[in-house]
Amino acid sequence: MRRAIRELGRVLKNVRVKSLKWTEIPIESADDMVLFTQMLSDGVALDELRFDQNGHENTQAILSSVDLSKYKKLDFEDNHLRTNGRADISNLIALNSPLETLLLSSNSLNDVDAVLIAESLGHYSHLRKLDLGYNNILERGLNALIRAVNDTSSLNALSDSNHSCHLGGLHGSVINENQCENLNRIFKIHLLMAERYRSGEGNVQYLNREIVGSNSVLLAPFIIESVHRRHAAIEEGGLAYSLRDTSLLGLLYELVKDWEMPDLFSFNN
């Protein structure tokens, strides 16, 4: 094994070698694993690593010992990985490294891991796909992950959510499926306002709570205009099917009729 790792290390010094697949080859010797992790750190041009079905100990050694900040894609699926509270995964995401794809399905990650990962997604990240399917993540962890990418507690919270990372492997997750971060933000804000409108509660009571201050009335024209602008952007982005149960005129009429209009005209006068 040690000889094979050394030979592989020589190969990885070639700048044309961009990816490495190491599947179902668990490394039993601690010394060999140290050599392997050093090899990964020294890889000149490596930016993709598939390391699956090799067990928890080997995977944890990579997470804790290898400089993964240069990788664009990491696949650690089916390793029975459990972190025992360690923050290696969430720290990697929060680094704002070039990492775009992180595959962690079929492991033993739990709610504590999910909460830490959710917190890391709150920071700006290049991550575009995170697969956490078939882990031990229950309601608490799932809710934390969903809030990280779709916090509907207020329009401001939703706007500040992560709009770039698609959470794969979670039941019913269609959030952030579009590759355009700005379109994901537009879609989610418009969907929240449409859901409030369809529920019968409307948007006015929420806007009165979420947009406060003596000059909030000045924002009214911009809010109303943005409703139309988001609707148009969603149609142009090929997501018009998602608007079939929403009346743009209904949304606009509610705002014009009930929100800030008397104060706005009084202010202008």
Question: How should these model regions be labeled?
Answer:
Residues 1-269:
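Leucine-rich tandem repeat or coiled-coil scaffolds
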